[in-house]
Amino acid sequence: MANTPSAQKAVRKVAARTQINRARRSRVRAFMRKFYDALAGGDKVSAEVAFKNFEPEIMRAVSKGVFHKNTAARKVSRLAKRLKALSV
């Protein structure tokens, strides 16, 4: 347990940031799930819409420090590859 007042405050701040980051990560996963659901349905138009909604959401998470930029780039690349395969 934190002994000094500043350490106690740091613990509180970390807990608050953890909640925010968990919500952001969950939101990104929800957008990814919508994309995969559209892919499973075979609907190209809804998959494109889901992809266009997913990409800025994950980049927003990168700018907030939730994901590393390479992780986001890899996820976007893989989803784009799946979208392209659907349209062929």
From Swiss-Prot:
| Functional note | Binds directly to 16S ribosomal RNA.
Q: Which gene encodes it?
A: rpsT
Under Pfam families, the record lists: Ribosomal_S20p (PF01649)
Q: Does the keyword Ribonucleoprotein apply?
A: yes
Q: Name one GO molecular function term.
A: small ribosomal subunit rRNA binding
Q: Which UniProt keywords apply?
A: Ribonucleoprotein, Ribosomal protein, RNA-binding, rRNA-binding
Indicate whether Amino-acid biosynthesis appears among the record's keywords: no
What is the protein's given name? Small ribosomal subunit protein bS20
Query: Membrane-spanning regions, if any?
Result: none
Q: Which InterPro entries does this one have?
A: Ribosomal_bS20, Ribosomal_bS20_sf
Organism, scientific name: Bartonella quintana (strain Toulouse)
**What taxonomic classification does the UniProt entry list for its organism?**
Bacteria, Pseudomonadati, Pseudomonadota, Alphaproteobacteria, Hyphomicrobiales
Q: Which Gene3D superfamilies match?
A: Ribosomal protein S20
Q: Which family does it belong to?
A: Belongs to the bacterial ribosomal protein bS20 family.
This protein's GO cellular component annotations are: small ribosomal subunit
One biological process term from GO is: translation
